[in-house]
Amino acid sequence: MSQSSRLSALPIFQASLSASQSPRYIFSSQNGTRIVFIQDNIIRWYNVLTDSLYHSLNFSRHLVLDDTFHVISSTSGDLLCLFNDNEIFVMEVPWGYSNVEDVSIQDAFQIFHYSIDEEEVGPKSSIKKVLFHPKSYRDSCIVVLKEDDTITMFDILNSQEKPIVLNKPNNSFGLDARVNDITDLEFSKDGLTLYCLNTTEGGDIFAFYPFLPSVLLLNEKDLNLILNKSLVMYESLDSTTDVIVKRNVIKQLQFVSKLHENWNSRFGKVDIQKEYRLAKVQGPFTINPFPGELYDYTATNIATILIDNGQNEIVCVSFDDGSLILLFKDLEMSMSWDVDNYVYNNSLVLIERVKLQREIKSLITLPEQLGKLYVISDNIIQQVNFMSWASTLSKCINESDLNPLAGLKFESKLEDIATIERIPNLAYINWNDQSNLALMSNKTLTFQNISSDMKPQSTAAETSISTEKSDTVGDGFKMSFTQPINEILILNDNFQKACISPCERIIPSADRQIPLKNEASENQLEIFTDISKEFLQRIVKAQTLGVSIHNRIHEQQFELTRQLQSTCKIISKDDDLRRKFEAQNKKWDAQLSRQSELMERFSKLSKKLSQIAESNKFKEKKISHGEMKWFKEIRNQILQFNSFVHSQKSLQQDLSYLKSELTRIEAETIKVDKKSQNEWDELRKMLEIDSKIIKECNEELLQVSQEFTTKTQ
């Protein structure tokens, strides 16, 4: 069986009979070792390193996932966001939990809900796109783009925090500083810049920088990088620099200095004041050179692709003619908070244009792969691989050497990955030390081995993964059920509710009175068709439940057989265990009897010692002449030893003084004549004699110390 077939056979990926009728999603995190699979309003989660069986949670009490919803995952993989045009649900994936059958526990995992109809007053604008802020602490910030081009930040873990709305209309006459016709959003890979793709004039790129959550997740390396960039920009200011630019750069340096002061090194986070979160849009970016033939087309999507393990990235924009342009930000822009229509160093350089000859639906990047972009079309997924030149470009940037770019060809490799209809997303799966790409639609799920395309992992990471795997392997008896019992109970509850609920289609009383055989029976046929569809859905649910119960019964029979076999093995070892137990009992009894004898002797000895201690005979007995002589000798030896110690200390001080004098004399007598050299030789001889004397004294002290030790024993 191939690697992809074994991976497809994992229980977590087994589809129900109604799976083709509902959308399915797959996500991964922590280098592809944590997997989340969604189908039939059930979240399944599975840790490759620690779990032997996947776990599941039904969220149908809160929403019914249909084709109107989109699902995204946070970078950490801890949160899922499900949204449509009117509502947003954020749910926590219960990593570490195995039993979440209780309703109150299930409700606790829905941590945020937003509804336009409930929250907004006045004109309502539908939701266009939602992103998790990649640098928010505990994934607590989501960014929402609406049809009216406003961008809202929600703190999903703090209900008291009011949402921050950017790019609002100013409701005044004259030029409006906001950006209209925003079709897509994307964060930079450092998480501090939000790119906006504007289609008013075909395809302009704007940016919010900095775009910050209420609590910013920042490590020391990134913090120092921001500070260094700010210092370089500040030092580059001169008399010709615009006043507005100077003000923004100075404010940026002050802001970054505050980040350093308030940074929590333990948790790697820093609180951001509201005034620094109200950034103003800047741009548009210049694209040099811009392909002339694209002036007649409109941009559709924007994405950022990491090209190394640092922060060097490529900005990719797709157009409705099937073109991709790959751009590089060649200048460092400054932060802007209070200046409208601000433009400074908003520059992008065109590196390559890729023509795909088909309509592009979406662009997807995987954090585990560098320099690769997945392009989703109607029924095909393609990979654009530009590592052939991106690695050289990254090296030139890091080493500040542009010479290798002279003969470099900027040509990306285009490869067809698979032909699948309606691909909502894809994920990277790390299973059995193999890298796999999971491609999913409502009807199919395929895996492709991409181990040869992956970036090399560090030895330490591999060691930690293998260690964790070995730690999780136990010798105990393990169940081999492929589906958790709570998931079967959920299917049963859904089926029971469907059985007792009436049909959604209500037959008018007038139609009920009409005989079935009549010339105008189209209405009756339509009613019967709708009712039959409802019953077919219930039949599918019943079949799904029946198949699950059937498989469970077979697995339980198999488990019963395994348990009986294990029980028989244990019973067969009973005689050997009894014999060993009797032998060990005899040894135990012998040790107990010996211990009791020793305890008896010890008690007798303690009684004698207590009698001696209490006896007046020993208390009144005088010390003998020999004992007094022995104690006096010990006292004399101690005094003599102490005097030797003091003498040795004095000699050591003399020696150190002589050494210091020797050093001083050596420094002063670099240029001496013959006579001085003779005197120096005599001094050295004297020092050697003194050194011998000191050595003899040390030997005598050592001998006396040994004699003293011998006498005192």
Swiss-Prot record:
This protein's UniProt keywords: Coiled coil, Membrane, mRNA transport, Nuclear pore complex, Nucleus, Protein transport, Translocation, Transport
Motif (Bipartite nuclear localization signal) on chain: 607-623
Predominant subcellular localization, coarse grouping: nucleus
Protein name: Nucleoporin NUP82
Oligomeric form and interacting partners: Component of the nuclear pore complex (NPC). NPC constitutes the exclusive means of nucleocytoplasmic transport. NPCs allow the passive diffusion of ions and small molecules and the active, nuclear transport receptor-mediated bidirectional transport of macromolecules such as proteins, RNAs, ribonucleoparticles (RNPs), and ribosomal subunits across the nuclear envelope. Due to its 8-fold rotational symmetry, all subunits are present with 8 copies or multiples thereof. NUP82 is part of the NUP82 subcomplex.
Entry membrane topology: Peripheral membrane protein
Gene coding for it: NUP82
Residue span of region Interaction with NUP116: 1-409
Spans annotated as Interaction with NSP1 and NUP159: 463-713
SUPFAM superfamilies in the record: DPP6 N-terminal domain-like
Note: Present with 9470 molecules/cell in log phase SD medium.
UniProt keyword annotation of Chloroplast present: no
